[in-house]
Design a protein with these regions (language model features):
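Acidic helix N-cap motif at the loop->helix transition within catalytic regions
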Residues: 64, 91-99, 107, 116, ...
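Juxtamembrane C-terminal module of membrane proteins
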Residues: 31-48, 287-302, 329-438
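Cell-envelope/extracellular polymer assembly enzymes that use nucleotide-activated donors
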Residues: 48-51, 81, 235
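N-proximal low-complexity "stem/linker" segments adjacent to membrane-targeting elements
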Residues: 1-69
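Long helical/loop segments within the catalytic core of UDP-sugar-dependent glycosyltransferases
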Residues: 109, 113-130, 149-230, 267, ...
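A conserved acidic beta->alpha catalytic loop
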Residues: 86-94, 110-112, 145
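Short, acidic, metal-binding catalytic loop of nucleotide-sugar glycosyltransferases
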Residues: 68-79
Length: 438
């Protein structure tokens, strides 16, 4: 009986594994094409006018780095205006902004609405009311630093008619510890194995964090910034897919931000992402599925956006369930003295070892693919690869925990790295990050 249970469990596992493998062919193709160089966008025929919006509550220790990088852009400065959003006039950020041209400080009035999305909505409505005309809005976090060609590269995409475009998200602190390097590696995966390939196949890309622009006519139609879930970036991506908004990704428009260095900070950050992901799916998935069925325009793009995650989730769930199945069965077998207990233990060790080895090799491939962008040392590369399976495995309890989190409070999180104009880093900075509360 014991052996039969193990045998049936194996059969079910291999069948589900095969099904998930077939359904993952599209993802595998994307990964392969992600290893090839990105396409270069042609030079723009016109320099367009942009507003750069920076939510910057209590960000006086980092805001200068971003404003300096904006000042040093290889772009017509008369076509750029920066809006820094604060909550109080006494914020030291306001004094720093006075040292820069074409920078306006906007003080929020409706502080009862907490969150980045509401801050963006206030300032954008203020801009619309002032009758200042901009063709698109760039969204940046205060701790970001832009490569000198960032806006020039993004302008190429806008000039080609893309209403939404994101740049290449790089990290300031690849060598800031295993948590920071694993976090940075996650964005490398999104950059290279997802958005690069999506752009190549003219699929809608997924915005991650900041470093993107959105055309002003979209926000004018909405009457402001209408994306106020916990993950406004993912919400924008979903909205653009639903409404057939043309989006792309430009690898050569590079910007930098800092990754968390402690597991606790990273946990809280990813907790917000997981909960926000659920919020957006709840808000948009029914509309997307309905659009897939009844709207012929970009039907395949929408179908892929909604359902492409299912094989991945299925593979993860199948592997976790089989691991738990063999672990429990092995313990029971050892307790009752079954002769088949060792084969079950061997199956458990094999599947856990295979998962670990897969993620180690996957991380190695990503680091090799991203070697031109990273400054990570060989030692830290090795540590990153060895620890990445634990980092990604932690998403499972994080996602489960997110289901029981209800309210959000914004708390300061210490950052330690600020980039100078020569690309070097120094230990200073703070940023705000959303932390879930039970």
């Amino acid at each position: 009986m014991y052996h039969q249970i193990f045998h049936v469990g194996n059969i079910i596992f291999y069948i589900l594994l095969a099904v998930c493998g077939v359904l993952l062919i599209q993802k595998i193709i994307y990964h392969i094409f992600g290893l090839f160089p990105s396409k270069r966008f042609p030079d723009a025929k016109k320099d367009h006018k942009y507003a750069i919006i920076i939510p910057a509550r209590n960000e006086s220790k980092v805001i200068a780095g971003l404003l300096d990088s904006i000042k040093n852009q290889n772009y017509n400065k008369d076509l750029l205006k920066t809006f820094v959003v604060v909550e109080q006039e006494s914020d030291p950020t306001c004094e720093i902004c006075k040292n820069y041209e074409n920078v306006e400080v906007f003080v929020r009035k409706h502080l009862e609405n907490k969150g980045k999305g509401y801050a963006l909505d206030e300032v954008i409505k203020h801009i619309f009311a002032s009758n200042e005309k901009y063709e698109a809005f760039f969204i940046c976090d205060a701790d970001n630093v832009l490569d000198k060609n960032f806006i020039m590269e993004m302008n190429k995409c806008f000039d080609m008619g893309y209403k939404l475009c994101l740049g290449y998200r790089n990290s300031k602190n690849w060598n800031g510890g295993w948590v920071a390097s694993c976090s940075a590696l996650t964005f490398s995966m999104i950059n290279t194995f997802q958005n690069k390939s999506k752009a190549r196949f003219n699929r809608n890309v997924v915005v991650s964090g900041t470093g993107f622009y959105i055309a002003s006519d979209i926000l004018e139609e909405l009457g402001g910034w209408d994306f106020c879930t916990l993950t406004e970036d993912y919400e924008i991506s979903t909205y653009s897919t639903l409404h057939n908004i043309k989006s792309t990704y430009n690898e050569y428009a590079e910007y930098y931000d800092e990754q968390p260095t402690s597991l606790k900070t990273s946990w809280n950050q990813r907790l917000r992402w997981c909960k926000g992901y659920s919020q957006v799916n709840k808000k948009y998935n029914k509309k997307l599925i309905k659009s897939v069925i009844f709207d012929r325009e970009k039907r395949l793009n929408k179908f892929e956006y909604v359902f492409s995650i299912l094989p991945v989730m299925g593979l993860i769930a199948t592997t976790i369930l089989y691991t738990l199945f063999t672990f429990v069965l092995a313990i029971v077998g050892s307790f009752i003295g079954s002769a088949y207990a060792w084969p079950v233990w061997r199956a458990f060790i094999t599947v856990v070892g295979a998962m670990y080895l897969f993620f180690v090799l996957y991380s190695m491939v990503m680091l090799i693919a991203e070697r031109k962008h990273t400054n990570i040392t060989m030692k830290n590369s090795l540590i990153c690869c060895l620890m990445s399976p634990f980092y990604w495995a932690s998403y499972v309890p994080i996602y489960v925990t997110a289901m029981f989190k209800r309210t959000v409070e914004w708390k300061p999180i210490i950052h330690k790295v600020q980039m100078s104009d020569d690309g070097k880093t120094s230990v200073e900075a703070t940023l705000e990050e959303g932390v879930e509360k039970k």
